[in-house]
From Swiss-Prot:
Reaction catalysed by this enzyme: phosphate(in) = phosphate(out)
Name of one Pfam family that matches: EXS
UniProt remark on domains: The SPX domain plays a role in the regulation of phosphate flux. Inositol hexakisphosphate (Ins6P) is bound between two SPX domains of the homodimer. The SPX domain has high affinity for inositol polyphosphates and its affinity for inorganic phosphate is two to three orders of magnitude lower.
Site (Gating residue for phosphate transport): 573
Compartments it resides in: Cell membrane
Family assignment from sequence similarity: Belongs to the SYG1 (TC 2.A.94) family.
Name of the protein in question: Solute carrier family 53 member 1
Oligomer status and interactors: Homodimer.
Organism: Mus musculus castaneus (Southeastern Asian house mouse)
């Protein structure tokens, strides 16, 4: 692998601008070589002056890059030292409390079943668990910084070697010895010491001396391109998707036959539509995950997933394919129910019952950790006023807004099975009299309207909670106003529908109010999508017209197509309200998957915007703490900032003299004297063809 590709694959995306600009240096060298005057037509002195001038510019650029790398490394190292001191304080406090407790006298006792513990023991158990997670995230940040150190040194060595080869000189090697090999980012070995001390602390204080268990907890996922999925996972993805395609073709022919013999199949459509939307959502989320990884958007950090164990796009395709097969088989069974001994109403119940069981299955099988994460996130979403709202919380609530049809169809299914289904018949899901008006299709008692408002309500109260936490009216209250327009839209749609059925004279008034709030809501959400969620139409966009200054995805056409798509689908309701009710139901069924697709496109650019925010803050790992930063920690941080090897003022002298000793006056743990050195090796080849 060429080093440029290796560098691109192994950098930390949030620190991309802080790495050596290897490609820019290569272009600089090749451009100088191409533009150099020929010895055949120019005297030798002119050629020498040309290359001397170029080398002066080249080494000045190298100095700027080296200063940038030194400064960034010093900042991140000071941050790591502060973080390690804080974690040591938190761990020492937990150990002190544990020693004072008569109920818990050793760390081993915290492993007994949680439901046998007292309240104090539960809190202590949770603190130790949080500390383990915090140390594992901190260890990951250290490995990333060590990786940054090694990649940049290798980059300088490679580019200076290439310089010497192209210009047929040794000044590049001399410059490396004089400047790079004495630079703080390379000579400072404090990062190795922190890695060793972290391993020792986790081994001796949190894992009772079991180094193998400690290193398993601290294991760092491969730094670089996505690792290939297990062969069996890929096999299952191909198998499930192939079967799903075949069953879909069969389903189309069966549906045509069913429509020819029985044209009143609307209940089947309503009952099975939600399942299809869920499967479509999972499949498109798999494509989202693949696209984010390919573009370098760190969705694992954004969603605060466990970097050591999370679902890849192959796993999402596998789940979507498996559920898709069950959905097809269940619907086919309904079509052929008249020749079956099993009543038709059993099949939908079996399908959705299995889906619910798959999600809440308490056994540690079928992606247990991911399912538990989703259930916990759903709980946080539905109890939003009582929790601090994170990105994953409002992202999931946003997805529910595009999946509101699933909630409405669930309400319809419950109503249908409760009031319209003839349980003593097995011919079909429809009432005996097709001409009988459907009770569950109406806005009876406002239940459908309330269900339709639930997703918007969840986002609304999340915005209020974020305002309570931050006291920032913009954007949180303004965003809450956006979701409040949904309440008016749904309310007037319900009033229009009920008054129209009863032939009231004020029906037209509610219709115009409905259309008015639809326009307000669509314009509001469209502007918010493009400007706030996606960060587009930035006045400093430069050459990225109507976009933003920095874009992640390679083609600008992606952004322009997404803008057009968002405008069209945000105003697609115009088609739905301009036609008859019967055809309107069909159009609504067509638009529901399109709304899921719109959300799929939205996901790409919303996470890109969040990723760029993380890049601006150089945030590459989760910051997990048991306790907030106290006064002592703040004082230590300020002292560290004032030290020579702490975070230095960028405007002051950037001398390469570096004092590697920093005194951290913290309670020493027993494990600190047993630290062992660990190093991450960076692939390095001296073959010039690979540079």
């Amino acid at each position: 692998m060429k080093f440029a590709e290796h560098l691109s694959a192994h950098i930390t995306p949030e620190w991309r601008k802080q790495y050596i600009q290897y490609e820019a240096f290569k272009d600089m060298l090749y451009s100088a070589q191409d533009q150099a005057p020929s010895v055949e037509v120019t005297d030798e002195d002119t050629v020498k002056r040309y290359f001397a001038k170029f080398e002066e510019k080249f080494f000045q650029t190298c100095e700027k890059e080296l200063a940038k790398i030194n400064t960034f490394y010093s900042e991140k190292l000071a941050e790591a030292q502060r973080r390690f001191a804080t974690l040591q304080n938190e761990l020492q406090s937990s150990l002190d409390v544990q020693k004072e407790s008569s109920a818990v006298t050793a760390l081993r006792q915290r492993r007994k079943p949680v439901f046998h513990l007292s309240h104090e023991e539960r809190v202590q158990h949770r603190n130790i668990k949080d500390l383990k997670l915090a140390f594992s995230e901190f260890y990951l940040s250290l490995i990333l910084l060590q990786n940054y150190q090694n990649l940049n040194f290798t980059g300088f060595r490679k580019i200076l070697k290439k310089h010497d080869k192209i210009l047929e000189t040794s000044r590049g090697a001399d410059w490396r010895v004089i400047h790079v090999e004495v630079a703080p980012f390379y000579t400072c070995k404090k990062i190795n010491q922190l890695i060793s001390e972290t391993e020792a602390v986790v081994t001796n204080e949190l894992e009772d001396g079991d180094r193998q268990k400690a290193m398993k907890r601290l294991r760092v996922p491969p730094l670089g391109a996505a690792q290939p999925a297990p062969a069996w996972t890929i096999f299952r993805v191909g198998l499930f998707c192939g079967i799903f395609i075949v069953l879909n073709i069969t389903l189309v022919f069966a549906a045509v036959f069913k429509l020819e013999t029985d044209r009143t199949v609307w209940p089947l459509i309503r009952i099975y539509r939600g399942g299809f939307l869920l499967i479509e959502f999972l499949f498109l989320l798999g494509i989202n995950t693949y696209g984010w990884r390919q573009a370098g958007v760190n969705h694992v950090l954004i969603f605060e997933l466990n970097p050591r164990n999370n679902l890849s796009h192959q796993h999402l395709f596998e789940i979507a394919g498996f559920l898709g097969i069950l959905w097809c088989l269940s619907l086919l069974a309904c079509f052929f129910a008249p020749i079956s001994i099993i009543p038709i109403y059993v099949y939908p119940l079996a399908l959705y019952g299995f889906m619910v069981f798959f999600l809440i299955n308490p056994t540690k099988t079928f992606y247990y950790k991911s399912r538990f994460w989703l259930l916990k996130l759903l709980f946080r979403v539905f109890t939003a006023p009582f929790h601090k709202v994170g990105f994953a919380d409002f992202w999931l609530a946003g997805q529910l807004n595009s999946l509101s049809v699933i909630l409405m169809d669930l309400e319809y299914m419950i109503c249908f099975y409760s009031f319209e289904l003839k349980w003593d018949e097995s011919k079909g899901l429809l009432p005996n009299d097709p001409q009988e008006p459907e009770f569950c299709h109406k806005y009876s008692y406002g239940v459908r309207a309330i269900v339709q408002c639930i997703p918007a309500w969840l986002r609304f109260i999340q915005c209020l909670r974020r305002y309570r936490d931050t006291r920032r009216a913009f954007p949180h209250l303004v965003n809450a106003g956006k979701y409040s327009t949904t309440f008016f839209t749904v309310t007037f749609a319900a009033l229009y529908s009920t008054h129209k059925e009863q032939n009231h004279s004020d029906t037209v008034v509610f219709f115009y109010l409905w259309v008015f709030f639809c326009i307000i809501s669509s314009c509001y959400t469209l502007i918010w999508d493009l400007k706030m969620d996606w960060g587009l139409f930035d006045k400093n966009a430069g050459e990225n017209t109507f976009l933003r200054e920095e874009i992640v995805y390679p083609q600008k056409a992606y952004y322009y197509c997404a803008i057009i798509e968002d405008v069209i689908l945000r105003f697609a309701w115009i088609i739905q309200i301009s036609i008859t009710a019967h055809v309107g139901d069909i159009i609504a069924t067509v638009f529901a998957p399109l709304e899921v697709f719109r959300r799929f496109v939205w996901n790409f650019f919303r996470l890109e915007n969040e990723h760029l925010n993380n890049c601006g803050e150089f945030r590459a790992v989760r910051d997990i703490s048991v306790a907030p930063l106290n006064a002592d920690d703040q004082t230590l941080l300020e002292q560290m900032m004032d030290q020579e090897d702490g975070v230095r003022n960028r405007q002051k002298n950037r001398s390469w003299k570096y004092n590697q000793s920093i005194s951290l006056r913290r309670p020493r743990l027993a494990s600190q004297s047993k630290a062992r050195d660990t190093k991450v090796l960076i692939e390095d080849t001296d073959d010039e063809a690979n540079t």
